[in-house]
């Protein structure tokens, strides 16, 4: 069962964090005592855990598999799925308050990432899209990997913003008939 654990950097002093919460798929820290977790299930939930009280609360259900710290803030972003198949990227204020809408997701996408200079990135099949983190900004295609026959999913940006790592699956190629 996937759970959150805390260790010293040398691997010693292992301790289970929030033992009642499992299975934890992804997590991000707001501060030293508050963690936001993607908890697997049907549906998956977004939970906020307080290490001081040992309690967690469900914030919302049916979220995407991508949660991130928003650069330069204590805020967290996540993808909220909707019954009609659409999805919205949401911001959870780190200092409290209700979630707020950032933008509609690209093509019902699950995966997003942030650059250090506040660009939001999303994948859609072989494409990568970007938009500024500001009201009224729109998505713009910035890369196309169609020639490589890749179906992109997860992405991560290096802390300095100089590199992007991608998880991709090779599309099934149609072979010519004999």
Predicted region positions:
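Sequence signature of WD/YWTD-type beta-propeller architectures
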Residues: 1-178
